[in-house]
């Protein structure tokens, strides 16, 4: 395990020191410019009370840091990994102001009196400081001016509405047990604000505080923090795609998860024995419900909920042959995941070892800090000590070599984290928001050293800006098993995707409460088909697994799982796009709706990838649902019936029991597969390629990404194939082309495509494949044309259809 230091947090200054420092009383009116120095890319502005460093990372990203007089620069960032590039920029002194302009991008203007920094992008005003770095009410603060009508997003995982302007958010990762349709504070609090003007401000400091999105209704974005770095980055974009690319380029992109992560999980709180776990896996096979992983909650290391946390080893009474069990599951294509927590109870088997090896956080005297919480009297692993990191990683490594495939990190806010507790790099309050982030880093770096060819699966309940680069799979916490709980989930996932964490998902069916509601369960699973991870999970009083529900419910749930597996090629492809560009899997309508007057700022309908429009049913007994079809001039087809809908229109549709309303964009290519019992059996050799034809689409394109599903960095190593599709339509002739890009280290795969063209109104006059007449089938009732494209390596073909 690496001993590389985790970035050290600046220690919190004593209140007496702060009150005497220049920062304590500095306001814009008192801050005066004293000089300007340009050092390569960085612009240094001296003031009477400190200095500013303005540093471009690219033409669209600029970082601003204030260093009060008497303090030193703290260059360490937990969030930022992008290396600044050399940019072409000009500096002009216009007497009353300085303008530092980056060619083709952001310009920074510094007004001299009163001192004020503002930002523009390509000549258009973006955002400006309203009140510079200062101190008020026991916090270090900075304020920005907002325009009327400007919407704000971000601040982590919340459930308050898509436009979060008007709220003041605490920055303190915290579990909210049993929340439903509303929660202002959850497990991921992130110091980032995104604007409808397509810019983001990231406050590069994980210490606890507040992010105020104009709660006082005075046009102010206000950041308040107990101490630490006074640094923020402004990211600008021409479009939402561009902004997502910029922000994730700054903070890191999510590596592609293993393919099995897009399958179905069996999970509950929890399986209490090896025999029970084996029976559950057997039941999925018997019911022909696909399964790729089983997750073991805390009973894997102890027989009781309380008193055993921190054992971090198999309870051999209840799991006597754990390694054999996991090997048997693996042979069936089912992976095993186990829960781990950062707490070591004083009653656990490892307590004495943890104390002796000095792996725990301490009190002021340097002794292990112990305290009571729900699970018992405990200490907390200090991952900021080399001893703590190495000790914990060695446990992971041992479990991994025994057969564990993935990790569930629970309670990682940390759930109870007393302010008096000390870590190696600072107080609990200084590291609290970044603890889960650095926990994921510990596992990711351990894999890079010991298992460099494998993709880790790291399911975490808490994190920070940039956690996605460690492969973190976030979930939305202990949501109530209620309709209100379901209603909040789309917003949480959409917002987190905009903040880089594109795999935010919920416990399907809801977690908290002994509620048996089959309709709620089915609707949640139907939504789950179109969320990043398909993982039913709940308290054990009511079964979370479809195999243990009523027959009618089981049938509907099976259909949802089958559709999830059929969509594996499409889902894996949009996950690859997320790795490459940072675009989230779930996307708000505003990403594609150009008209701000339209109702695109809603979470009740969203985009899945670039092609699907999804409206989950979130009310019991719903007989109607509103769907806004974005982008006037576009056409959307009902995924289940083929009915066409025009874009730019808000419609009321009638839901059916078998599925939720889902639509596909005209011009979309959707690769799908035959359903398999486990993704291990997916080969990618036979693909159903659905193309949604419409006369309004003159040209379109799509792709299929494929690799072995398990090798870390497969694309970068050239171990991949991309099959690209394109279409043109003119003079009643539709042409669809296939061409394959094979990576330098990939052996070309022989693939056959069943091309299925939707919305064909009459039987074609002729169909050719590579210039030769081809057989086809035409379903006049469904308006569906099917053409077989023969299997070949490095697939390259041209299909021409005369309509």
Annotate each predicted stretch with a short phrase:
Residues 3, 17-18, 653:
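N-terminal compositionally biased, intrinsically disordered segments and leader/signal-like regions
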Residues 27-29, 126-659, 664-665:
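Catalytic-domain carbohydrate-binding cleft regions of carbohydrate-active enzymes
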Residues 6, 23-26:
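N-terminal metal-binding scaffold of metallo-dependent hydrolase/deaminase domains
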